[in-house]
Amino acid sequence: MLRRFILDRSGNFGIMTALLVVPLLGAAGTAIDFGSALSLRTELYAAADAAAVGSITPKSDAATQANTMSGDGSLTLGKSEAQKIFFSQTSKKQGDVPVTVDISVQKKAGILSSTVSFNATMPTTFMQVMGFHQITVSGTATAQYETPSYMDFFMLLDNTPSMGVGATPDDITAMKKATANGHDKGKDKNCAFACHIVSEKGVEDKNSYYNVARNNGVTIRIDVVAAAVKALMAKAKDTQSMASQFRVAAYTFGKTAQDAKAAKLFKVSDLDYNLGAVAVATDMINLMSIPSQNYYNDQQTSFDEALKGIDTEIKGNAGMGTSNADRQKIVFFVADGVADSYKPAGCTSPKGVNGGRCIEPIDTSNCQKLKDRGIKVAVLYTTYLPLPDNDFYNDWVKPFETKIAAKMEECATPGFYFAVSPTDGIEEAMEALFLKIVSAPRITS
């Protein structure tokens, strides 16, 4: 009888259906529950991504807090903002699902990092018949944002009489032509330099070659430097990621030769966020005046004293540039590379001194002192123009002419050097050097 029951095929469909209905319903229920869990996971990941990214954007609370920190650390404002963003991204239908969120927002070496981890426990519906009462959904989203480099530029501009030379070969030719007859009984004929004579009482000599240049439309080198600095302020304003990223101060070697003798820099502009105001101030960048020809034996170009002066102007630490409170200090030095100063000891000229007067390529020891402080030194070398028909040039400059550019490059922080010839544009060169500086990788250790 048992054998007949086993071999009997009638009613098998009903029996098999009864046997399979529970696993079939369980499988279908599992698919539905897992589908809901997958939907929840997708939504929570999207919320975590939004929170991780949104909490460290340039205008986020975390970025604002990081901007005030001179060092590294946790950004509590970023954590609060990330939490708000996360829960604002979840839908109401998921509101009954308990979700825990762990958030970390940190600043380290100028990089803001956020980590948003979530863990949710979703109750099941159909899977409960199989003994599974909940599904755990978890995940982590991370994001990073490198803050812009905050920089303070201290522009040190050589405005000494040698910067009164014609800006281009054509300007030099025009200047020589304009001075072909010389002055004061034929002295200083065919002069390429526009000396600016203003007496110690402030009375300007209208016949000085500075005014000859002006009256004949001759552009001198300091004019081009001043125009380049003004244009650079517009470029810097367009380049910065935020209004506070760059500050600029500008100095010349002195308004007068008397200032230079006293080692007193002329401050064109205080260190300022307002780059437009700095641009306006560039109108005060003029050729240094001298009270008379051969005043102080023409010893107005002391790179040593100018670099010492700018070193004194730069207060506090050199900075890493990671925040507004940790701004990187940069000297932007523009000069033609030939010093002419009273330096009876330590002159590097191969000809030595002449009665205490030292004409030499730049002595880089004061550049090194700035670099030893951690201050970056950017050098724009406005190539010294050879004047083969000038006795002073042939006697005192030509012996070290081949070293001028090399010494200027030695003064600069590696990679922060640019040379511009008389036929090149100083404005373009200054902009190129600036962009090179602001795009350089930030060293964090």
Residue ranges and their predicted role:
Residues 10-22:
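N-terminal signal-anchor/signal peptide hydrophobic helix marking the start
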Residues 21-35:
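Short, strongly hydrophobic transmembrane alpha-helices
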Residues 2-4, 10, 32-445:
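P/S/T/G-enriched low-complexity
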